[in-house]
Amino acid sequence: MGICEIHRNEMYVYFYLERGEEAQLLGIFKEKNSGIKKAEQGTCRIVDLICPDRKNYSFRGGKTFYDMPAYLFYMDSCTWTSDSRFEIVQYSEDRTLKVTTCYEFAENADAFSCKSILENLGDEEITIEGITSFCFGAAAGYEKGKSDPSEDVEIYYAHNTWSEECRWVHKKLKDVGIWAYGNLCYDRFRIANHSGFSTGEYLPMGALYNKQTDTSVLWQIESSTSWAYEVGCFTPEYRESFLKTDYRQQIYLQLFGPDMESAGWYRRLKKGERFETVETAVACGMGRPESVMKEMTVYRRQKRKIMELPIIFNDYMNCLMGDSTTEKLLPLIDRAAEAGCEIFVVDCGWYDTGEWQYTFGEFEECRQRYPEGLSEVMDYIRRKGMKPGIWLELESVGLDCAGLQNMPKEWFFQRHGKPVIDSGRVHLDFRVKEVRERASAILKRVISRYHLGYIKIDYNLELSCGTEFQADSPADGMLQHNRAYLAWLEEEHAKYSEVMFENCGSGGLRMDYGMLSRMDIQSVSDQEDYRIMAVIAANSASAVLPEQAGIWTYPLKDADRESCIMNMASAMLQRIHLGGNLDQLTEEGFALIKEGIQCYKEIRKEIPEGIPFWPLGFHSFDAGWLVFGLHLENRDLIMVCRREDEKKRIHFPVQKGVEAVNVLYPAAEKRIAQKDGIENDIVVELERENSAVILEIIYE
């Protein structure tokens, strides 16, 4: 076959497919490239496979990129299995291993997903210590006498930890240790996760930006357990790529699920057994990665369609903090209904007194908290015109749960023959049928008993790599559990299609599209300070669809006008998770919350169609100003926030043809927002620090 061109939307993807040779991904382009040619062997293969007994002549240092002779060979088998899915099949030389690599192209977006499926066709076990879900060996090039990709290519990655989610940074490759000097190179940059907190340290995302060509490639790994990505360089003769420069040195990219290096993962593939890698997604486009988020957003919406955006009140954050009672809840319910909320969630602690963090598991209401029963509270919520919701943690059991002693050891994650303990919890294994049945029974009981319309599912433990029990490796046990759990979630969501399911992992510590393709809303953070929550909110649409991103807004009882406004504005272009002491606010403060909710109800139907954009780029956590918006048809909605910055004015670019600039919220507050003298620029003036505004930009 030779060169294979795929043209989807505005993207050209080129493969080299020739019988008896390894399949190659030659490049991803925004324009047709008639001069594309076969790459040097070992440089652009579509799959990298790590086997301990594979002949390895590669001088690579710690890299997992193998610049070595082919291991897999294309044998005349590539197929469009649907209008959007392209599959390439390769075999090992002895025909004992079959690898099918699947590219699923998004509709109306320059993006695709990628994964591989392995099948053992031989009689002997094959041990796999790692396999790429996506591999691209042509991300940039190098030519002596000119500046190198270490200088011209930037990598974007995002720190993500408890209460400090979505902290994007970008650096030149040389500043992360990749110094492309045109010789044999061991340099690499690797980001990885090794536990069930899939986003406990970093987002499973990244990007490469080439300033010479002003192009970016952006990726996400859709794993709820271990994952890794690696960027490095090598020096072949091949010089074509999407991130094309005039250099000979190439920058490669590999995306993994669990592997040996990052999580101690391995899998013994028995005769006839199959293994599927985690799914990944890749998007490309002109400009910096913030611009390419458009393509990723369209792709994500094809994974999960969310159209209903009800206003949620949750009694936890800066409110009852897990100490709810009937007496405390009833006035909050009254005030939430008056404010315009449509769902009222009773968060953790409803099942016990005292150290409720460690007694959960049976999920029976605590009569000391609710003397007439929790049903009294839930009925009252419904009478006030809202749907009731409740908190559950279903993948673990508290160490002080009364029923723990009756659960067999086989139900739990184990290492060294004993259940693994973390954060006062033991982890349940959803590969076990009885564990799934127990969770299903809990869901059925609480949904039917309390007539729920909302379930918040939390996850609060860090178990490192996983479970050894009935698994080749702990990380593979974790992967198998997670796949069983996600399948169970899909089944339960289908049973209760009218119930909204929230994903929470100590806030945003399990914020991946393995989970989010099956959940309705994500708790983005547990951050309690609205000033920090604002920057998390402004960046969160990079990780989560705006219509899935639950943003806390929690005015304190002594909140002044500006803090009430900033609380509301931070959430109004995404999803409102209202908390705080609504029943103790001043009348002025409550009126501002109510106004914000009413404004949100007028714009929310457009949020699932909006394309996020960042006129100033992703925000650092010490940014003085925040500007985040949604492109809509003929208009933009923009949140502008002045944090602790001496400057009262901010200028930022928008699209051409501005007709009008309107302040949507707060309507009665003085905010200067207008077209600047500079073409396509807007200027906003906010008198006070820690203040905000929601703008509408109307175009001609």
Task: List the predicted regions and their residue ranges.
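Catalytic domains of carbohydrate-active enzymes, especially glycoside hydrolases
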Residues: K328-W350
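Active-site-proximal substrate-binding groove within the catalytic cores of carbohydrate-active enzymes
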Residues: V13, L17, E21, Y485-Y699
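Conserved, mostly hydrophobic/aromatic
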Residues: S116, G272, I381, D458, ...
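Active-site-adjacent "subsite" loops/lids of carbohydrate-active enzymes
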Residues: E308-P310, C319-S324, C366-R367, G389, ...
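Short Pro-Gly-centered flexible turn/kink motifs
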Residues: R267-M286, I638, N690-I698
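Acidic/aromatic-lined carbohydrate-recognition and catalytic surfaces
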Residues: F105, I128, Q249, D352-C401, ...
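Polysaccharide-binding surfaces and accessory modules of carbohydrate-active proteins
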Residues: G2-D246, P666-Q674
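Hydrophobic faces of well-ordered beta-strands that scaffold small-molecule active sites
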Residues: I311-D315, F344-V346, P388-L392, I455-I457, ...
